[in-house]
Amino acid sequence: MQLVHPPLTLVAVTISTLLAGSVQAATPESQDTATADETLTVLGQTYRNTATKTRLDPIETPQAISVVDGETLSLRGVSSVSEALRYVPGVNTELRGGAVNRLDLFNIRGFDNYQNFYDGLLLQYNDWNLQPQIDPVAIEQLEVFKGPTSVLYGSMPPGGMVNLIAKRPQRESKHNVSVATGTGTLKEMTLDSTGAINEQLAYRLVGLAREKDGQAVTSKEERYVFAPSLDWQLGERTLLNLNLYYQKDPEAGIYTTVPASGSAKSNPLGQLGSDTFLGDENWNEYNRDVTLLGYKLSHDFNERWQVLQNARYMDASAYQRNTYNAALAADNRTLARNAYLTDEDSRGVVIDNQLAGKVQTGSAQHNLLLGVDYQYLDAHILYRDTLDYSAPSIDIFNPNHSQIVPEALTFNYQDKKVIRQSQTGVYLQDQVRLDRLVAIGGARYDRYRMDTDSRTLYQGADSQSLAHIDQDNLSFRVGALYELDGGFSPYASYAESFEPVPGADKQGQAFKPATGHQWEGGVKFLSDDMSKTATLSAFHITKKNALVTDPDNVYGPKLQTGETVSRGIELEGRADLTSQLDLALNYTLMDMEITRDTTTLQGKTPVWVPRQMASLWSNYYPGGNLEGMRVGAGLRYVGEAEMDAANTDKVPDYLLMDMSASYDLAALSASLKGMGVSLGASNLFNKTYYSCYDQNNCWFGAERSVEARLKYAF
């Protein structure tokens, strides 16, 4: 496994706004304080940096973290978390194409991630089809914490995590409404209102209504969001934040796939269009409701010690009717299908208790963190499947989308599951500053339990099974960063992760958790005037204890000897080149390999892992006669990836262009104060591109999308 190093170009992307804290950075103290105050005003007193769970500056953290702030989200007009991550290095989005947007599916440093965090708490996922999504309309910024994060967050993949920071009440009255239209007969309205109620209370109200045609023919997308929150100053040192997030998705487009032949690969009979739908409009439904009710209670005992309790309750449900495909027939056009449905509901609780303090020992300042968190999920799942490909087949080049008669379907298989899982974690962290040296160390103990009760019915035969997981794990993290003159800060770190693994080996011994560890080194840069930032990082991640097939009994219990290695380089930065022009770029070079397996997969690269990714975005503010105008443009490149696990073919690389423009109408007339218009285009030249899991399951990338928006702020 050899990693080729191309010429490195200095690149740029926003890392973060400086946070509050008594520890001095290398930049002037007045700039730090002003920026910190501004950040805390926007993000709220209960905000904590994702990488440390403290108010410390991410630029001091010896591990890579990328931040996409609210201004960037607004300028680019994103409508999903995956879209918001398109310009983040090390992250590959749209794993299932652009027509599928009901789930946030992406990988970080090569490892798939299906669970986001919202305001520091896990969005609980039942590992089936009920994944809570947060719409960007309710997000203040996104923070991508690269590498293992288990010391602070418990069970997570080793590639990293995404934390979505919610919009919080502000004391200054601000009200924004907008309407939008565009591709797919888009109809959208948004509301964002905040202000003080009295000296103790401040509110925020965010709302959204969106309806549009999906990319695939016959499909629709519809979403409603209602997200109020309240800050209650209970005293000079105590703040209570109450928050609600409700989202209803009556329709969520499609989830069906297309074969590689006719999409990512040539078919002798022709090629499919990017609006292809190989499901059935009589059996295509996804209806989801998500309610998140939470609070944050923070109290400052004094200037050195604070406590924060962050808690949330989730109630979610989803109903789905869909089809899946067999391999394409020998005639290169007939596709056999099965019909299935899922009916799912989940209820869960997540709570995180944090005690943070500052202690001086000689010339060293310690920022201590002690935490205890707990999560519980109760999930119920019904799955029914016709099996035997008894649903009507479809001609991929002349599809009939109305063949299925729901009442005539016979379900030969049914599975009812009740899943109850809990995780308790205790963690300790110390971040120490000694002059220009910043060192961090942390440890965490986790206890994970899961019980699964399954009752299956297959062609009239009833059976029941019980599965139990009781695993614990100890995770560690260490790192150091040194601030040199000129704004450069080299760093190095080591971090660990774990993920529970169900089942037992052939001796009946329960499997151990899958573990990961990462070595990372790099350098961060922040100019004195804070107009330029950059991060160069090199990483090496190893994931162990993956399940593999026993070569002596391929249908028997698995062996726990699998190993995967991901290593690479990321370059990220941002520069304000002039007062009118800014530039952001990033580059990722990654090599991922299955290094231990009992099958021919050893030595292969997993799917969805391009070797190279790069992007560039620039904003220009003309001024003069065009005062109030902004024009932005971006390029994003995703290299070729493996088409299937056996690496038999490649998914082609692609280069896409996005654009956006906005204009403050007050520049035309003072009577139009507060009004603005914007225009955004994604995949401007309508490039056709693909994503594949294997030869039978591919997805089209997002077609060109254009959106026009009228805003009014008062």
Task: Please provide the spans of the model-predicted regions.
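Conserved C-terminal beta-signal and adjacent last beta-strands/turns
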Residues: E344, L368, V607-F714
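Outer-membrane beta-barrel translocator/receptor signature
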Residues: Y125, V137-E140, V151-P228, W232-T238, ...
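Membrane-embedded beta-barrel scaffold of Gram-negative outer-membrane proteins
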Residues: K296-D300, Q306-R312, A318-N322, P513-D576, ...
